[in-house]
């Protein structure tokens, strides 16, 4: 049984993130949800919000991305998150994340 799952965050211009992970949480249309290795296959629509990637343990996320919404394809060994925009907000303060969120909303309304 795999202990990690491959995670990719894909935008039209680049692969914003790609690493093995212990767990990922993301914003679905019905609320936040988490994905662990060996998950059942599914495709989920995503809303704008934070994607948190847990690399070394499931208690502290090491990478956080603000996405503009999109879709994710999940299998037992990989997660592909396809989004129009993804901003790495891992090392930003709460107020800086709010500013980035506002900027992302302006971009997605055009």
From Swiss-Prot:
GO MF term list = ATP binding; proton-transporting ATP synthase activity, rotational mechanism
Q: Which gene encodes it?
A: atpC
The keyword rRNA processing belongs to this UniProt entry's keyword annotation: no
Annotated protein name in UniProt = ATP synthase epsilon chain
Membrane topology (UniProt): Peripheral membrane protein
Say which species the protein is native to.
Rickettsia typhi (strain ATCC VR-144 / Wilmington)
Q: What does this protein do?
A: Produces ATP from ADP in the presence of a proton gradient across the membrane.
Keywords of the record: ATP synthesis, Cell inner membrane, Cell membrane, CF(1), Hydrogen ion transport, Ion transport, Membrane, Transport
Please provide, in alphabetical order, the Gene Ontology terms of the cellular component aspect for this entry.
plasma membrane; proton-transporting ATP synthase complex
